[in-house]
């Protein structure tokens, strides 16, 4: 079975789950997952995990993200995207000076409520399922970090604001559109969204599913943030059997265990000072 991860350029109009179908077919395995949902209306980089690398999903999901988004003022949909039902309208379209002033409030550590149509769990159910069934529920605000917002363009005549946003995991761009518009006494939704970066991985290095090849599969060697630890030949069998080997490691740190010949043996994650768990054993 193949093991590795892929930088996929997800096309607009497909769900993240649907995007995995050709990958499963190409590698002839159902052991394929993704690390971080991209909405159906969105496009951009999606990290797909193949084989044992699916166990690294939490790591990839924890990485910072970058998006290019377009907000349309004057209309709000229930989903806060182009596919939703219009629930709010206004003739007031904010001016550029006010937008630039308010954007500063959305940089740094902020609290936001995820959209009602999202995959957030509410008492064991997905929020979007409750919303589809017309259920009333509240979503608690969550703390996220927005590192930078760059205004790319603003067309007052079409009410379209284009932004580049760098943020932490769990940040909802649709919530930023909603909250920014409300702060300007208007309303808005995200008319287009493209994810351009996940951690160090960029959209320009991704591939469309139709262009998949064995060369598209990336190994752990590319993860520069994972320190490589050389294991003595006398301890290789211990590692392959998931036994403890003394290794210096910090909490939440990932390390790759290799033989002196360069064979990747395992991936470990620190759970305390110099204590770890095996994430993958090859």
From Swiss-Prot:
What residues make up the catalytic site?
A: 39 (nucleophile)
State the reactions this protein catalyses: uridine(55) in tRNA = pseudouridine(55) in tRNA
Q: Which GO terms describe its biological process?
A: mRNA pseudouridine synthesis; tRNA pseudouridine synthesis
- Which of the seven top EC classes does this enzyme belong to? isomerase
Pfam families named among the record's database cross-references: TruB_N
EC number of this enzyme = 5.4.99.25
Q: Which GO terms describe its molecular function?
A: RNA binding; tRNA pseudouridine(55) synthase activity
Listed A to Z, the keywords are: Isomerase, tRNA processing
Give the protein family. Answer: Belongs to the pseudouridine synthase TruB family. Type 1 subfamily.
What's the stated role of this polypeptide? Responsible for synthesis of pseudouridine from uracil-55 in the psi GC loop of transfer RNAs.
What name is this protein filed under?
Answer: tRNA pseudouridine synthase B
Give the encoding gene's name. truB
């Amino acid at each position: 079975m193949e093991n590795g991860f892929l930088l996929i350029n997800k096309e607009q109009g497909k769900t993240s789950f649907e995007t995995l179908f050709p990958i499963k077919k190409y590698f002839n395995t159902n052991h394929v997952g993704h690390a971080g949902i991209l909405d159906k209306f969105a496009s951009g980089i999606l990290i797909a995990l193949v084989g044992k690398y699916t166990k690294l999903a939490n790591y990839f999901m924890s990485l910072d993200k970058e998006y290019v988004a377009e907000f349309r003022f004057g209309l709000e949909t229930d989903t806060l995207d182009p596919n939703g039902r219009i629930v709010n309208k206004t003739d007031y379209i904010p001016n550029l000076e006010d937008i630039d002033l308010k954007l500063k409030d959305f940089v740094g550590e902020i609290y936001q409520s995820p959209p009602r149509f999202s995959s957030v769990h509410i008492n064991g159910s997905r929020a979007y399922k409750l919303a589809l069934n017309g259920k009333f529920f509240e979503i608690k605000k969550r703390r996220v970090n927005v590192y930078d917002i760059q205004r790319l363009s603003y067309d007052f005549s079409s009410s379209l604001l284009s932004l580049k946003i760098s943020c932490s995991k769990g940040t909802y761009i649709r919530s930023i559109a909603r909250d920014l518009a409300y702060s300007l006494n208007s309303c808005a939704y995200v008319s287009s969204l493209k994810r351009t970066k996940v951690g160090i991985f960029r959209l320009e290095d991704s591939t469309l599913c139709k262009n998949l090849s064995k060369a598209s599969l990336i190994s752990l060697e590319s993860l520069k943030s994972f320190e490589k630890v050389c294991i003595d030949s006398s301890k290789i069998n211990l590692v392959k059997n998931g036994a403890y080997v003394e290794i210096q490691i910090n909490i939440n740190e990932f390390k790759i265990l290799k033989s002196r010949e360069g064979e990747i043996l395992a991936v470990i994650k620190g759970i305390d000072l110099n204590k770890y768990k095996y994430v993958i054993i090859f």
